[in-house]
Amino acid sequence: MKIQFDDPVFEAWTQRFLFTMPERGCEIGEIKTTAARIPEGNRDAWYQEWTATADRLSAEAEACWARSARVSARDLYMRASTYYRTSYPLLYGSPTDPRVKAGYAREAEAFARAAALFDPPIAPVAIPFEGMTLPGWFYSGGPGTRPLIIGTNGYDETVQIMHYGHAVAAQRRGYHVLIFDGPGQGRVLIQDGVPMRADWETVVRPVVDFALTLPGVDPARIALAGWSFGGYLAPRAASGEKRLAALIADPGQWDMIEAMRAMFLRFGVPSEVAKALPDVDESALEPIFAAIRRDPQLNWSFVQRGLWVHGVDTLTDYLRVCIAFRLSDRVGAISCPTLITAAENDPVAAFAGHLYDALTCPKTLIRFTAAEGAGDHCEVSARSVYFQRAYDWLDNVFGMR
């Protein structure tokens, strides 16, 4: 389904947040009319037009709030936040474009205004971490002691979008939910300039410490759920944080360098060269690097986003950083019940079976298919199918039925 653009990056980000529609995070008509105002390939216009739509909704939300129309104000702020979020990903890169910082600030502000209007309100939290704080939100599942789901992000998203990707569906089932952004994510990357790190157990440990100070959290029933690159980060965290009682990796991932080697093989790199990555002569890789830069989607994924997220300057440096992001030497330390997902058309899920096979803990593998509409990355075309199966699994693990 094409909405507007021939450029795959523009079109992907136009469609990106359609999955928020069931929770009133966007409207298809607003998306179509905004996209129609943007000339093909014009990134400045992209930022301007999505910002203009978000500004209009934000102003309308303020007017609704002034006349005590709380529900209308909340819904308008939520959609404004989504469109501010949409405004800046095409500008990713190092040094961080001031428009990325401004877009993120507006996104977070609109979400915060909406969060205060939920019943119960969604509570902002600041999690202490290595002399700074990690931004997050706490959702109460109701009175009494209840299990907690901690949601961890991946490469692309901000904590605000995890409202739709994790939190609301879990809260509806009676779970407390804590979502946060860590190094290399959201505000911590965009405004604080802190890049991604491999040792996610070091990040999650103080998050669990903080979670145990929240009202009504059952310390024996804490789950960690990661989506997108969180499908690496969450298992890595579970290998070193034993207070986690359940783990969800959506999708399951493996050593990052192995995924890169597989990609280079598809580009026609000889197998002996691919196996030696990253310790090969850079001149042998330059034709592949040039092909990556020519491809709009790959250039955005690896040059604009990847180098920026990891705080490196070259694709060779990126490959070297990948070595640290591995599970093969830690998977045996994961002891809690674990759910691994894999969507049929998701290349990020290519190594989900490797992770599942290597696990020695109680484990479940759920595959999502294109035929049921859930075959895309993180099942975003049918996220409710993910919620049904993943949270049914967790209900059984935690005795929520």
What does each model-identified segment do?
Residues 50, 54-57, 100-143:
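N-terminal cap/lid segment of alpha/beta-hydrolase-fold proteins
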Residues 155-168, 351:
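The serine-hydrolase catalytic nucleophile loop
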Residues 359-376:
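Catalytic histidine neighborhood in serine/cysteine hydrolases
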